């Protein structure tokens, strides 16, 4: 829903002046990225308007594994003033080998709604650390965001996640522990049932966190 995507972008508040980079590693048709473009456009200054406008294209990154959503996302970017959307990649974020993620590719902000309940193919994620090794899609995305995608100091995340990730046991508890040790998980917002179709029966949460300090206080809104 647009109201939620806009709210999440506003909370993360990427800065055009600082040329902050924003990635959605499961971008679908590009809802979070178009909301980010609109947010950044609101920061264009009169003095350096043309330069600012050009910079927006370099601030946005997206990865989508399915062909049709990828195509729609590229079209969506064009409709939002990005002439050559080369930064929208068509691949599966989770099949990139762990050590291929370079420090130089880290971003300031990750805003995403990863697929829930999916199980990745055999062999995917085998190179994750043993204690957080899983084939559950949403959990894998969260580990990757925390460990590999966000800037170490002050990288900001906003992620839609199911209850299982927050309250599950076993590997899920270890994934949550990793998040809370590496990041300041400052806000959790519980959404009413059925907000994110097609997961109508699954309780979902918005998690907002900043990397670089462990979690102390969490605001939990229900």
Locations of regions flagged by a protein language model:
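Conserved S-adenosyl-L-methionine
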Residues: 2-109, 117-119, 135, 139, ...
């Amino acid at each position: 829903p647009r109201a939620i995507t806009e709210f999440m972008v506003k909370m993360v508040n990427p800065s055009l002046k600082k040329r902050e980079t924003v990635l959605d590693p499961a971008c679908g048709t590009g809802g979070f990225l178009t909301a980010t473009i609109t947010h950044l456009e609101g920061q264009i200054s009169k003095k350096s308007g043309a330069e600012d406008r050009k910079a927006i294209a370099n601030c946005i990154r997206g990865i989508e594994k399915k062909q049709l959503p990828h195509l729609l996302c590229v079209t969506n970017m064009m409709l939002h003033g990005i002439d050559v959307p080369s930064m929208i990649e068509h691949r599966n974020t989770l099949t990139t080998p762990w050590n291929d993620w370079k420090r130089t590719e880290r971003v300031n902000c990750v805003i995403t709604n990863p697929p829930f309940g999916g199980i990745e193919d055999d062999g995917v994620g085998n190179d994750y650390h043993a204690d957080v090794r899983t084939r559950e899609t949403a959990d894998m995305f969260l580990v990757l965001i925390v460990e590999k995608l966000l800037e170490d100091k002050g990288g900001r995340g906003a992620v839609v996640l199911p209850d299982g990730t927050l309250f599950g046991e076993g590997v899920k508890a270890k994934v949550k522990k990793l998040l809370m040790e590496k990041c300041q998980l400052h806000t959790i917002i519980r959404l009413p049932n059925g907000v994110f179709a097609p997961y109508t029966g699954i309780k979902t949460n918005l998690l907002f966190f900043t990397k670089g300090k462990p979690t102390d206080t969490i605001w939990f809104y229900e």
